Structures are given as C-alpha cells and as structure tokens.
Amino acid sequence: YKRQQKLNTLASIGEFKGELGDLTVHVELGKDTITISDRGIGLTAEEIEKYINQIAFSGANDFLEKYKNDANAIIGHFGLGFYSAFMVAKKVEIITKSYRDDAKAVKWTCDGSPEFTIEEIEKADRGSDIILYIDDDCKEFLEEARVSELLKKYCSFLPVPIAFGKKKEWKDGKQIET
C-alpha cells in the first residue's frame, strides 16, 4: 500500500508517467510456485540491498525461529513480513525493475539463509514478481481454495484489488472458466 501511495505521489508531481499496475497472484502447480506480481514502482539493486537484505537479515532468523509455529504473530513486524515467506518456501526470488528511466532490472534469490544472490537481468516492464518455491511439506498452499481463503482473510481490506484464479460463469448451459 505504501509503495502504491509513493507511485501516486510520483505521478502527481510528474516524476512518473505511466499506468498504475495490477496486483496478481498466480499458482503454477508444475513448478510448485506461487508468484505475486505488481506493476508498481519496482526496486533498484540498491533498494533491495537496503530494504530486503539489511533489515531482514538483522535478526530475522531469530524472529522466524521464535514464531515458526505461529505465522499470525509475524504479521505487522516491519521488514519481517516478507521473510515469513520462508515458512512455506524453500527459495524465494524477486524479479524487479524500478520505475526510474535509468534503472536496470535485477533478480534476487535466497533460500532463507543469510546467503543470497543478486544479478542484473532483462525485464521489459517496471514492477516486481515475487516467486515462492513452495516446500514439499507445505503443498497445501498451492491449492486454489487455500490461496483464496488466505487472500480473503488477510487482504480483503487492502485499498488495491488482488486478481487470483479464473472467473467462473455459465455459458451454453455449463460452467466455464474465463
């Protein structure tokens, strides 16, 4: 939400020209991944270093160990909400490109340890994709009904809509996905 506000502010003062993007959640069963995507302001390599690495790795491991059996206790802790992803994912990737004209796209990869990689990549559009590679013992989070339930529980009051799944409608006497 704060990143959306920043994008709105940048647009209002003429520093950003473009459309505000969609927030989507996509499950890919064959790869056991959940991808959360937006067309927001994105991140630079420096911002990933500052906001993802420095904040999260300063105490995140101890915090996650303390609350590993109570995911609800993590919600709202600055810098640690993102790292709760490692409670269900064996690896997380962030593929992102900042709104800045001179920005290079980057991919950050981490397995939950303090070790990570960051590399420049090609990405046409601004925004971010966060890809969770779901642990074998957490496959329930790949089920459409479970993801839907969690999105409704934790995201229904967000000021931006989240697209997930396919819409079902009746056509020619049967239900189809669109």
Predicted segments, located by residue:
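A short amphipathic beta-strand at an alpha->beta junction
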Residues: 159-170
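GHKL (Bergerat-fold) ATPase N-terminal catalytic module, capturing the glycine-rich phosphate-binding loop
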Residues: 2-136, 140-141, 149, 156, ...
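GHKL/Histidine-kinase-like ATPase module
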Residues: 116, 145, 160, 173-178
